């Protein structure tokens, strides 16, 4: 629906993507009026005297995690309503960015330890099924119980119990790559072709980019349950927030999604892609035998 809205109302923001041979949503450089840097905004919020309770809570959260994780302010940024300045002090959440693979690993380890401490004001948002309780469940191939289990162990979704405001504030620690970790594949990929729908059992062989968007999992397919018979599926790539940090190295997973052939300058391979489009709620990557 979002794609159709942009195509109808803002066609100038539809850019041709050569490997896909179709237009996608994007912004051309000459249409950019302003760029807002998450790390600069956060630095200003932290260095200034807090003007409201949400800023004070943000400063408190950063102080707690930095003291335990031995990270610096430079490793963080802020996004969402705090970045753009339209937050509500009494109702908005705290959306933080953590830059870099090593720092993400460090913050996850730190949060895990804080969650175990009964005296910590930071708790795991998914220590129970409360975040999804009573909501309509649309995903077809992952149950609410399975979803909560996966979310809980990611640790990046927290709740801060603020004594001053008496609020339980949701806090997200969004993993983002450092500039030096980013590799642009656009020039290397010649063509991406949709081959059909696939269901497979696989083993995660590499998960170093599973924390980011898109999430990339290098896999070895153990069994192709349904779909085109190919023998060179190398990775699962997910553009869906629900499936970031979903599986770790050496874990066995069930995957269902779009099979794509990727042709590069050096050869070709197949990938399973979880993305926005038809059969959205049938897509999944989940760990097997986790309970």
Please identify what each model-predicted range represents.
Residues 1-91, 99-291:
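Catalytic core of pol beta-like nucleotidyltransferases
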């Amino acid at each position: 629906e979002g794609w159709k809205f942009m195509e109808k109302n803002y066609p100038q923001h539809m850019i041709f993507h050569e490997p896909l041979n179709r237009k996608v949503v994007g912004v051309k450089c000459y249409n950019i009026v302003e760029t807002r840097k998450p790390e600069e905004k956060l630095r200003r919020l932290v260095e200034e005297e807090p003007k409201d309770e949400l800023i004070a809570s943000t400063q408190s959260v950063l102080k707690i995690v930095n003291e335990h994780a031995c990270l610096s302010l430079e490793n963080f940024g802020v996004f969402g309503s705090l970045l753009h300045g339209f937050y509500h002090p009494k109702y908005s959440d705290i959306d933080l960015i953590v830059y870099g693979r090593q720092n993400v690993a460090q913050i996850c380890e730190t949060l895990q330890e804080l969650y175990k401490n009964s005296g910590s004001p930071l708790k795991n948002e998914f220590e129970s099924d409360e975040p999804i309780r009573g909501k309509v469940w649309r995903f077809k191939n992952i149950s609410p119980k399975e979803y909560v289990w996966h979310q809980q162990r990611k640790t990046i979704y927290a709740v801060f119990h603020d004594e001053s405001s008496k609020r339980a504030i949701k806090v997200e620690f969004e993993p983002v790559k450092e500039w030096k970790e980013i590799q642009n594949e656009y020039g290397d990929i010649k063509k991406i072709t949709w081959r059909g729908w696939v269901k497979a059992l696989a083993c995660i062989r590499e998960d170093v980019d599973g924390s980011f968007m898109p999430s990339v999992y290098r896999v070895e397919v153990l069994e192709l349950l349904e779909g085109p018979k190919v023998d060179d599926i190398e990775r699962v790539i997910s553009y869906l927030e629900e499936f970031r940090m979903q599986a770790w190295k050496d874990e066995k997973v069930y995957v269902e999604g779009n099979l794509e052939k990727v042709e590069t300058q050096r050869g070709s391979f197949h990938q399973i892609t979880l993305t926005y489009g038809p059969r959205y709620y049938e897509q999944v990557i989940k760990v097997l035998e986790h309970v």
